[in-house]
Amino acid sequence: MFFRAYAKINISLDVVGKREDDYHLLEMIMQRIELYDILEVTKNKTGINIKCNKSYVPLDERNLVYKAAKLFLDTYNLKGGVDFNIIKNIPVSAGLAGGSSDAATTLLAMRELYNIDVSDDELCKLGLKIGADVPYCIKGGTALCEGIGEKVTNLKGFKGHILVLVKPKFGVSTKEVYKSLDINKIYRHPNTEGLIKAVENNDLRYVSENMRNVLENVTLKKHTIIKEIKEKMIRSGALGSMMSGSGPSVFGFFDDMLKAQRCYEYFKSKYNDVYITRTI
């Protein structure tokens, strides 16, 4: 059986507090995009086996697919195992939830493969044990995510909007970005309520002009190239441009495919991981 594991972008990312265990409390609007990994999943009699088309992806218990499969088998006391063949298209350490989406898709695939009667909400609780973005990746679409990311409220779809996505030639550690964030020095928060209304009204211009990610300045201090990519996107005709998640991926929304294509071609001459895609 084949399953798609979709990437996400952030339309907004705000940090509104911090728990005693040092996890940050978030308020984010997440959006699924048409960039995906493919998971080929097959039952076997014993063990979890992983293959992948990218050599840098670990094939053992460090892989979130492995963790998700093991968690599912253990939780429901299932005998047997599963083989995975991962076709990796989403860049790693990019702020696009590639690993979390693979884990979420693994849980959904295991439910189908083993015919277990378990709701999406129950899968989300399992997924949270793997990572804070996994519950959103199970539900997908357009959503407001709160808490550490586990409270997912689906919004009316913000579908079909063109974006150009660029991942620079380095990765970023989410943990390190949050560690470097001083929540007392966040002077400009996103207007999450206004963005929710704009998303639900399908108002691309308002969304593009008012997107905000409070982690951007943290990552920018170490990687000024992010600012340069954003500025070039705007000059290329993007309605707005922002870093996704903890970075370093940057995206820009376009209302003109020709402008988007030209922007794509410019960045493709400089970077490997460049995409024209859409919100879904």
Curated annotation (Swiss-Prot):
A Pfam family reported for this protein in Swiss-Prot or TrEMBL: GHMP_kinases_C
Pathway the protein takes part in: Isoprenoid biosynthesis; isopentenyl diphosphate biosynthesis via DXP pathway; isopentenyl diphosphate from 1-deoxy-D-xylulose 5-phosphate: step 3/6
Gene3D superfamilies registered for this protein in UniProt: 3.30.230.10, GHMP kinase, C-terminal domain
GO molecular function: 4-(cytidine 5'-diphospho)-2-C-methyl-D-erythritol kinase activity; ATP binding
Keywords assigned: ATP-binding, Isoprene biosynthesis, Kinase, Nucleotide-binding, Transferase
List of catalytic residues: 8, 133
GO terms under biological process: isopentenyl diphosphate biosynthetic process, methylerythritol 4-phosphate pathway; terpenoid biosynthetic process
EC number(s) reported in the record: 2.7.1.148
Binding site for ATP: 91-101
Family: Belongs to the GHMP kinase family. IspE subfamily.
Family matches, as HAMAP family: IspE
Primary role: Catalyzes the phosphorylation of the position 2 hydroxy group of 4-diphosphocytidyl-2C-methyl-D-erythritol.
Protein name (record): 4-diphosphocytidyl-2-C-methyl-D-erythritol kinase
